[in-house]
Amino acid sequence: MRFFVLGAGSWGTVFAQILHENGEEVVLWARRKEIVDLINVSHTSPYVEESKITVRATNDLEEIKKEDILVIAIPVQYIREHLLRLPVKPSMVLNLSKGIEIKTGKRVSEIVEEILGCPYAVLSGPSHAEEVAKKLPTAVTLAGENSKELQKRISTEYFRVYTCEDVVGVEIAGALKNVIAIAAGILDGFGGWDNAKAALETRGIYEIARFGMFFGADQKTFMGLAGIGDLMVTCNSRYSRNRRFGELIARGFNPLKLLESSNQVVEGAFTVKAVMKIAKENKIDMPISEEVYRVVYEGKPPLQSMRDLMRRSLKDEFWAS
């Protein structure tokens, strides 16, 4: 089965190149023709510096075949409209995107089930495209159908794939870590509050796990690569858009204007909208996410949010909110 990669941003392009170098047949779809031409003619991409891209690119969705494995690598808020445009139903879907659809509160697996109803798997973990492109050691988690077969086809000497059975946990961990990373970036913008950042990341994984377990996720998923692994890299890496977004907020930039002017999607800023709606409907305590929402959408001063988190009622540590 051929891989049809939907999305030629940094991660979609790098992942397509992994597959191609593994001997797989791959087609990479890009929305813009100029990106397609760069990849096909110059073998370069504006999203992947200093790497030769040797996959074939197209901007024609009609090229997808029903035998293909569709790899989703576009922002979550645009997945539905692209799936509805597909001329055929693919043999299965492998999702690389991280987030929750705002208007429905659905995870990507639920969107795929609703529209395509085909086998589904999700790949997640600490995997910034910039490092994978340089073939630096990376390990990720794959959950879902046909995971053992996909594990063999995707893994390389530098890209190690583990499997698990918890699709819900892997999806939720990947989505919510972006929200916590915005808060981590705010602390970075304050000038390196190491104690506070360690506490934030620790309490953040509890918050993510609490949300996920409400929907049936396995607690141990959040202690693995898809959970604490991805959270750590997103909260600390210079490549993290969500962390950088929070850092700029702390330095005085208007968050809504930042979102308008950004040429890359800050997924956590959209995910937090969906998370807070779901949390309120189900009475799930999400104190960090709530403060991120207030800073981004209600104009609350970030320093005040940090203070309010510290002033919450005292609790036991383990699995307390």
UniProtKB/Swiss-Prot annotation:
One of its GO terms (molecular function) is NAD binding. Coiled coil: none annotated. GO terms for cellular component: cytosol. Pfam families: NAD_Gly3P_dh_C (PF07479), NAD_Gly3P_dh_N (PF01210). Keywords: Cytoplasm, Lipid biosynthesis, Lipid metabolism, NAD, NADP, Nucleotide-binding, Oxidoreductase, Phospholipid biosynthesis, Phospholipid metabolism. The keyword NADP applies. One of its GO terms (biological process) is glycerol-3-phosphate catabolic process. Signal peptide: none annotated. This is Glycerol-3-phosphate dehydrogenase [NAD(P)+]. Its EC number is 1.1.1.94. Catalyzes the reduction of the glycolytic intermediate dihydroxyacetone phosphate (DHAP) to sn-glycerol 3-phosphate (G3P), the key precursor for phospholipid synthesis. It catalyses: sn-glycerol 3-phosphate + NAD(+) = dihydroxyacetone phosphate + NADH + H(+); sn-glycerol 3-phosphate + NADP(+) = dihydroxyacetone phosphate + NADPH + H(+). InterPro entries: 6-PGluconate_DH-like_C_sf, 6PGD_dom2, G3P_DH_NAD-dep, G3P_DH_NAD-dep_C, G3P_DH_NAD-dep_N, NAD(P)-bd_dom_sf. It comes from the Bacteria. It comes from Thermotoga sp. (strain RQ2). The active site is at 177 (proton acceptor). NADPH binds at residues 10-11, 31-32, 47, 98, 129, 241, 265, 267. Its main location: cytoplasm. It is found in: Cytoplasm. HAMAP family: NAD_Glyc3P_dehydrog (MF_00394). Belongs to the NAD-dependent glycerol-3-phosphate dehydrogenase family.
